[in-house]
Amino acid sequence: MNQTSKARIKITQRMLNKSIIDANKSVVAFVRNCYPTLGYDFIENGGKKVLLAYYDDGHSFYRYTPTQIRLYRRPRGDKLLSVEGLTRRAKAGDVMTFEHDKESNRIIVRLELGEDIE
């Protein structure tokens, strides 16, 4: 049985400038599967929820840095998110992955270096 669920987002300069990211299908499915009662289906238009997560800063369980993933819905219903500290860690072209580790019940945020986007 799979021990993890994942979501992936390719970071753009606009995401970094605005600190707001449109939730793609993988993010919506990730939240729905990992946190069924906290997902976008349970956020009213104009509301938000906060999930505790951890940046993977190395290969050791003890090298994770706490962060927050904020899930939002605009008044018209658009699904958005922001990740605390992302602008200090990522650049346009990087790929951000959310991974749910069922064993520890943690969301791990990983950044993969990508090509620069202009």
Where are the language model's segments positioned?
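Acidic, low-complexity intrinsically disordered regions
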Residues: 1-118
